[in-house]
Amino acid sequence: ELFSSEGEKRTIEKITGVESPILSVVIPSYNVEDFLSQGVKTILNHNNAGKIEIIIVNDGSKDHTTQVARELMDTYNIGEYPVIKLIDKENGGHGSTINEGLKVSTGKYFRVIDGDDWVDSENLEKLIGILEREESDIVMTDYSEDHATVNELINKKIYEFMIPGQQYIFEDLCYPGYGFDEWGPILATSCFKTQMMKDTQFKLTEKCFYVDMEFDVYSIVNARTVTYYPLDIYRYFIGRVGQSVSKRSFMRNHEQHAKVLFNILEYLKTIPNISQGKRSYILDKVVVPMTKAHYLIVGTYWTKRRFFVNFDKRLKNYGEIYHHPAVANRFVKFHRRTGAFLLKFNTVLIKIKRVVVR
């Protein structure tokens, strides 16, 4: 209900685009025929819509996603510079849609809004006005989780330590206790200078989940400045079947999770001149949390010895992470010492520990 009402606040007429858009919005779309139209309407439902470039990237959908996209183009495009564009491609995964969308983006800033998500139209209108005059490499805002099953929006404020509208040097926010806490710039909160992103010359892993973590790394490598505005814009839809953040999905796709982690570790080797602040940021905000999560997946969710041993053996090649105190906790050290033969007895061991502690 929240989703549909936002897209129907007013009637949207045909929209005349501009040669140099302020914001390029890439919409990765796979089997989202039930969501795409309403989501796009929320992006266009304001007076600054003509300054936006929407790039729908259909990732080999098996439903009518392409048809919906073409209907949106017919409904709203007019003039020499279409507001809505479509890339229709074979399935290559979420990363491939961002790769292809960025290539053709012409806006001053670039961001991603998934095909089953939506935005607050009024706040997006305000953001476009801000981006017109803003020059920071990254502009961050707030977002909310849309828990559809209970029809509730849960606002997420992760940049409250920043003074709204003040430009910060990214490097200065990389130090523990002062800058970014759990998260820095992420897909749900951030607009990135388009040319900066293109100059980074990255390619997200294709046909793979969890590439948002790769994006979080690539997007800050060349960033020098960052600014925050307290506008609640993005609506992250929670509750769709098959979302990659579920326990079952983590178990099913654990090899892809490991692949992304090791891709990031290898990428760090290719940028030896990156500042210590940014390197620490990447390790603390991306690599270490992913590594801890993976030990949870292979050690607690699966409890299969070979999964644990294979991952642990491979990680040993990256000593800084392998021995990191947040990674090499008591659980991990115990199963390393015992060759992971006791993984299947985790539940029993935990119960014994609780009795002993009492």
Regions found by a protein language model. Give the residues of each.
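Cell-envelope/extracellular polymer assembly enzymes that use nucleotide-activated donors
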Residues: 21-24, 53, 214
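A conserved acidic beta->alpha catalytic loop
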Residues: 42, 58-68, 92-93
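Membrane-interface aromatic/basic loop that binds lipid-linked glycans or pyrophosphate carriers
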Residues: 1-5, 136, 298-358
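Donor-binding/catalytic cores of nucleotide-activated saccharide
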Residues: 115-226, 236-252
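Glycine-rich, basic loop-to-helix element that forms the pyrophosphate-binding segment
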Residues: 88-105
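Acidic helix N-cap motif at the loop->helix transition within catalytic regions
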Residues: 37, 63-72, 122
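Short aromatic/hydrophobic "clamp" motif used to bind/position activated sugar donors
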Residues: 110
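N-proximal low-complexity "stem/linker" segments adjacent to membrane-targeting elements
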Residues: 1-45
